[in-house]
Amino acid sequence: MTRGILIFAFSNEKIDYLEQADWVADRVNTYLDLPVTIITDTKSINGRKFKHNLILSDAISGGQRNFKHTEEGNVGTWYNSNRFQSYNLSPYDETIAIDSDYVVNSDQLLRVFESKHDVLCHRDVYDITGTNRFAPYNTFGKHKFPHYWATVLFFRKSKMGKEMFQLMEMVKDNYTHYSNLYKFSGNIMRNDFIVSISLSILYGHKLDAIPTIPWAMPSAYDDVDLEQLDDTKFKISYTKTTNGEKKPYKSIINGTDFHFINKFALDKVIHA
Protein backbone atom coordinates (compact mmCIF):
# COMPACT_ATOMS: atom_id res chain seq x y z
CA MET A 1 0.00 0.00 0.00
CA THR A 2 1.68 3.20 -1.18
CA ARG A 3 0.97 6.61 0.32
CA GLY A 4 1.93 10.06 -0.83
CA ILE A 5 1.09 13.72 -1.24
CA LEU A 6 -0.13 15.34 -4.46
CA ILE A 7 0.18 19.07 -5.20
CA PHE A 8 -1.13 20.90 -8.27
CA ALA A 9 1.09 23.86 -9.15
CA PHE A 10 0.55 25.89 -12.31
CA SER A 11 2.30 29.26 -12.11
CA ASN A 12 0.80 32.44 -13.56
CA GLU A 13 1.68 36.09 -14.15
CA LYS A 14 1.69 36.86 -10.43
CA ILE A 15 2.65 33.75 -8.46
CA ASP A 16 5.24 31.01 -8.86
CA TYR A 17 3.05 28.18 -7.61
CA LEU A 18 5.62 25.56 -8.54
CA GLU A 19 8.27 27.14 -6.34
CA GLN A 20 5.79 27.26 -3.46
CA ALA A 21 4.82 23.63 -4.06
CA ASP A 22 8.49 22.64 -4.02
CA TRP A 23 8.96 24.38 -0.66
CA VAL A 24 5.88 22.67 0.78
CA ALA A 25 7.07 19.32 -0.63
CA ASP A 26 10.33 19.65 1.29
CA ARG A 27 8.28 20.12 4.45
CA VAL A 28 6.17 17.07 3.61
CA ASN A 29 9.36 15.00 3.38
CA THR A 30 10.52 16.36 6.74
CA TYR A 31 7.34 16.13 8.82
CA LEU A 32 5.34 13.37 7.14
CA ASP A 33 8.19 11.31 5.68
CA LEU A 34 6.11 10.80 2.53
CA PRO A 35 6.92 11.16 -1.16
CA VAL A 36 5.44 14.07 -3.10
CA THR A 37 4.25 14.31 -6.68
CA ILE A 38 3.69 17.76 -8.17
CA ILE A 39 1.38 18.23 -11.16
CA THR A 40 2.62 21.13 -13.29
CA ASP A 41 3.47 22.18 -16.85
CA THR A 42 6.61 23.07 -18.83
CA LYS A 43 5.81 26.78 -18.66
CA SER A 44 5.85 26.65 -14.86
CA ILE A 45 9.09 24.63 -14.82
CA ASN A 46 10.76 27.23 -17.06
CA GLY A 47 13.96 25.24 -17.48
CA ARG A 48 14.54 24.74 -13.75
CA LYS A 49 15.36 21.45 -12.03
CA PHE A 50 13.37 20.09 -9.10
CA LYS A 51 14.15 17.10 -6.89
CA HIS A 52 10.52 16.07 -6.37
CA ASN A 53 8.54 13.90 -8.78
CA LEU A 54 6.90 16.05 -11.47
CA ILE A 55 4.03 14.99 -13.74
CA LEU A 56 3.18 17.24 -16.68
CA SER A 57 -0.36 18.21 -17.57
CA ASP A 58 -1.90 21.04 -19.57
CA ALA A 59 -2.96 23.82 -17.21
CA ILE A 60 -6.71 24.52 -17.23
CA SER A 61 -7.78 28.06 -16.39
CA GLY A 62 -10.55 28.70 -13.90
CA GLY A 63 -10.75 32.37 -14.85
CA GLN A 64 -9.18 35.67 -13.81
CA ARG A 65 -9.03 36.66 -10.15
CA ASN A 66 -7.43 39.17 -7.82
CA PHE A 67 -4.87 37.26 -5.74
CA LYS A 68 -4.97 39.76 -2.89
CA HIS A 69 -8.38 41.18 -2.06
CA THR A 70 -6.99 44.09 -0.07
CA GLU A 71 -4.91 45.49 -2.94
CA GLU A 72 -5.52 46.39 -6.57
CA GLY A 73 -3.31 45.24 -9.43
CA ASN A 74 -2.89 41.61 -8.41
CA VAL A 75 -5.16 40.12 -11.07
CA GLY A 76 -3.93 37.03 -12.88
CA THR A 77 -5.06 33.80 -14.49
CA TRP A 78 -6.06 31.13 -11.98
CA TYR A 79 -4.99 27.73 -13.30
CA ASN A 80 -6.93 25.82 -10.68
CA SER A 81 -9.16 23.51 -12.71
CA ASN A 82 -7.05 20.35 -12.99
CA ARG A 83 -7.99 18.92 -9.60
CA PHE A 84 -10.37 16.39 -11.12
CA GLN A 85 -7.28 14.66 -12.57
CA SER A 86 -6.02 13.69 -9.11
CA TYR A 87 -7.27 10.11 -9.22
CA ASN A 88 -5.76 9.29 -12.61
CA LEU A 89 -2.47 11.13 -12.08
CA SER A 90 -1.65 10.09 -8.53
CA PRO A 91 0.94 7.26 -8.41
CA TYR A 92 -0.18 6.29 -4.89
CA ASP A 93 -2.81 3.90 -3.51
CA GLU A 94 -3.69 6.45 -0.84
CA THR A 95 -3.25 10.14 -1.60
CA ILE A 96 -3.67 13.46 0.13
CA ALA A 97 -3.92 16.27 -2.42
CA ILE A 98 -3.01 19.60 -0.83
CA ASP A 99 -2.83 23.18 -2.06
CA SER A 100 0.60 24.75 -2.51
CA ASP A 101 -0.29 27.29 0.22
CA TYR A 102 -0.98 24.60 2.82
CA VAL A 103 2.00 24.81 5.17
CA VAL A 104 2.84 21.35 6.49
CA ASN A 105 4.21 21.99 9.97
CA SER A 106 3.54 18.71 11.83
CA ASP A 107 2.71 15.05 11.26
CA GLN A 108 -1.02 15.56 11.82
CA LEU A 109 -2.03 14.68 8.26
CA LEU A 110 -0.85 11.11 8.84
CA ARG A 111 -3.99 10.58 10.93
CA VAL A 112 -6.11 10.96 7.80
CA PHE A 113 -4.72 7.71 6.39
CA GLU A 114 -6.19 5.88 9.39
CA SER A 115 -9.75 6.70 8.33
CA LYS A 116 -12.10 4.00 7.08
CA HIS A 117 -13.54 6.47 4.57
CA ASP A 118 -12.21 6.59 1.00
CA VAL A 119 -12.77 10.33 0.46
CA LEU A 120 -12.27 13.08 3.05
CA CYS A 121 -11.79 16.83 3.17
CA HIS A 122 -12.33 19.64 5.67
CA ARG A 123 -15.79 21.02 6.37
CA ASP A 124 -14.69 23.49 9.05
CA VAL A 125 -11.91 26.05 9.20
CA TYR A 126 -10.38 27.86 12.16
CA ASP A 127 -9.21 31.46 11.72
CA ILE A 128 -5.80 31.56 13.40
CA THR A 129 -6.09 35.34 13.83
CA GLY A 130 -9.32 35.05 15.80
CA THR A 131 -10.95 37.60 13.48
CA ASN A 132 -13.45 35.08 12.10
CA ARG A 133 -12.81 36.13 8.49
CA PHE A 134 -13.95 32.74 7.22
CA ALA A 135 -17.49 32.87 8.63
CA PRO A 136 -18.95 33.83 5.21
CA TYR A 137 -17.35 30.69 3.74
CA ASN A 138 -19.38 28.29 5.86
CA THR A 139 -21.88 28.08 2.99
CA PHE A 140 -22.06 29.26 -0.62
CA GLY A 141 -24.79 30.37 -3.01
CA LYS A 142 -28.23 31.76 -2.28
CA HIS A 143 -29.37 28.35 -1.02
CA LYS A 144 -26.62 28.38 1.66
CA PHE A 145 -25.17 25.07 0.53
CA PRO A 146 -22.51 23.63 2.89
CA HIS A 147 -18.99 24.66 1.89
CA TYR A 148 -16.41 21.87 1.89
CA TRP A 149 -12.74 22.75 1.39
CA ALA A 150 -10.64 21.29 -1.43
CA THR A 151 -7.42 22.49 0.25
CA VAL A 152 -6.77 19.05 1.74
CA LEU A 153 -8.43 16.18 -0.14
CA PHE A 154 -7.78 12.57 0.83
CA PHE A 155 -8.74 9.65 -1.41
CA ARG A 156 -8.02 5.99 -1.96
CA LYS A 157 -7.78 4.18 -5.27
CA SER A 158 -11.18 2.55 -4.86
CA LYS A 159 -14.62 2.52 -6.45
CA MET A 160 -15.78 5.44 -4.32
CA GLY A 161 -12.55 7.36 -4.86
CA LYS A 162 -12.85 6.97 -8.61
CA GLU A 163 -16.52 8.00 -8.60
CA MET A 164 -15.66 11.15 -6.64
CA PHE A 165 -13.28 12.42 -9.29
CA GLN A 166 -15.58 11.41 -12.13
CA LEU A 167 -18.22 13.55 -10.46
CA MET A 168 -15.77 16.41 -10.07
CA GLU A 169 -15.01 16.29 -13.78
CA MET A 170 -18.72 16.30 -14.58
CA VAL A 171 -19.38 19.30 -12.32
CA LYS A 172 -16.38 21.14 -13.80
CA ASP A 173 -17.56 20.48 -17.36
CA ASN A 174 -21.05 21.72 -16.47
CA TYR A 175 -20.03 24.49 -14.10
CA THR A 176 -22.43 27.08 -15.54
CA HIS A 177 -25.36 24.69 -15.07
CA TYR A 178 -24.44 24.00 -11.44
CA SER A 179 -23.83 27.68 -10.70
CA ASN A 180 -27.36 28.37 -11.93
CA LEU A 181 -28.77 25.43 -9.98
CA TYR A 182 -27.06 26.31 -6.69
CA LYS A 183 -27.29 30.07 -7.27
CA PHE A 184 -23.65 31.12 -7.04
CA SER A 185 -21.46 33.17 -9.37
CA GLY A 186 -19.93 31.06 -12.11
CA ASN A 187 -17.41 33.68 -13.23
CA ILE A 188 -14.52 31.95 -11.45
CA MET A 189 -14.25 28.20 -11.12
CA ARG A 190 -13.88 27.18 -7.48
CA ASN A 191 -12.60 23.74 -6.50
CA ASP A 192 -14.32 24.10 -3.15
CA PHE A 193 -17.69 24.36 -4.87
CA ILE A 194 -16.89 21.47 -7.21
CA VAL A 195 -15.88 19.27 -4.28
CA SER A 196 -18.94 20.29 -2.24
CA ILE A 197 -21.40 19.48 -5.02
CA SER A 198 -19.60 16.26 -5.93
CA LEU A 199 -19.63 15.03 -2.32
CA SER A 200 -23.35 15.72 -2.12
CA ILE A 201 -24.02 13.66 -5.24
CA LEU A 202 -21.64 10.91 -4.10
CA TYR A 203 -23.58 10.51 -0.85
CA GLY A 204 -27.01 10.64 -2.45
CA HIS A 205 -27.60 14.26 -1.37
CA LYS A 206 -27.66 13.15 2.27
CA LEU A 207 -25.49 15.91 3.67
CA ASP A 208 -25.42 14.48 7.19
CA ALA A 209 -23.84 11.30 5.79
CA ILE A 210 -20.76 13.04 4.36
CA PRO A 211 -17.66 12.23 6.47
CA THR A 212 -15.01 14.91 6.95
CA ILE A 213 -11.53 15.34 8.36
CA PRO A 214 -12.26 15.43 12.12
CA TRP A 215 -10.63 18.76 12.95
CA ALA A 216 -10.99 22.32 11.72
CA MET A 217 -8.34 23.52 9.28
CA PRO A 218 -6.25 26.39 10.72
CA SER A 219 -6.30 29.19 8.14
CA ALA A 220 -5.29 32.81 7.59
CA TYR A 221 -6.85 35.27 5.12
CA ASP A 222 -4.92 37.07 2.40
CA ASP A 223 -4.40 40.26 4.43
CA VAL A 224 -2.26 38.45 7.02
CA ASP A 225 1.54 38.72 6.90
CA LEU A 226 3.96 35.91 7.70
CA GLU A 227 7.49 35.52 9.03
CA GLN A 228 9.32 32.25 9.70
CA LEU A 229 11.20 32.23 13.01
CA ASP A 230 12.54 28.67 12.91
CA ASP A 231 11.66 25.30 11.35
CA THR A 232 8.19 25.02 12.94
CA LYS A 233 7.62 28.49 14.38
CA PHE A 234 5.97 31.26 12.37
CA LYS A 235 4.86 34.77 13.31
CA ILE A 236 1.68 36.15 11.78
CA SER A 237 0.84 39.87 11.71
CA TYR A 238 -2.66 41.22 11.18
CA THR A 239 -5.10 43.94 12.19
CA LYS A 240 -8.05 43.40 14.46
CA THR A 241 -10.91 45.73 15.33
CA THR A 242 -11.23 46.31 19.07
CA ASN A 243 -13.84 48.74 20.42
CA GLY A 244 -14.32 50.10 16.93
CA GLU A 245 -10.61 50.75 16.40
CA LYS A 246 -8.27 48.76 14.15
CA LYS A 247 -5.13 47.69 15.97
CA PRO A 248 -2.07 45.66 14.91
CA TYR A 249 -1.64 42.19 16.41
CA LYS A 250 0.94 39.43 16.22
CA SER A 251 0.62 35.73 17.04
CA ILE A 252 2.93 32.72 17.00
CA ILE A 253 2.08 29.50 15.17
CA ASN A 254 4.22 26.60 16.32
CA GLY A 255 4.03 22.94 15.29
CA THR A 256 0.63 23.29 13.62
CA ASP A 257 -0.28 22.98 9.95
CA PHE A 258 -2.04 25.99 8.48
CA HIS A 259 -3.59 27.18 5.23
CA PHE A 260 -1.99 30.53 4.40
CA ILE A 261 -3.82 32.31 1.60
CA ASN A 262 -1.49 35.32 1.22
CA LYS A 263 0.74 33.89 -1.52
CA PHE A 264 2.87 37.05 -1.66
CA ALA A 265 3.78 36.81 2.03
CA LEU A 266 4.48 33.10 1.61
CA ASP A 267 6.80 33.93 -1.28
CA LYS A 268 8.79 36.27 0.98
CA VAL A 269 9.20 33.48 3.54
CA ILE A 270 10.49 31.12 0.86
CA HIS A 271 13.08 33.67 -0.28
CA ALA A 272 14.07 34.92 3.18
What is each residue range found by the language model?
Residues M1-A9, L18, I38, R48, ...:
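A glycosyltransferase accessory/donor-loop signature
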Residues D16-N29:
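Short, well-formed alpha-helical segments that are part of the catalytic scaffolds
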Residues Y17, S61-T70, I128-F134:
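Short, charged, surface-exposed secondary-structure boundary motifs
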Residues D33-T42, I96, V119-C121:
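Short, hydrophobic beta-strand segments that form beta-sheet elements in well-ordered domains
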Residues K43, H117, F145-P146:
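Catalytic phosphate/metal-binding cores of nucleic-acid and nucleotide-processing enzymes, i.e., regions
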Residues I45-S90:
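Active-site-proximal specificity loops/subdomain of glycosyltransferases
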Residues Y79-G130:
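GT-A fold catalytic core of metal-dependent nucleotide-sugar glycosyltransferases
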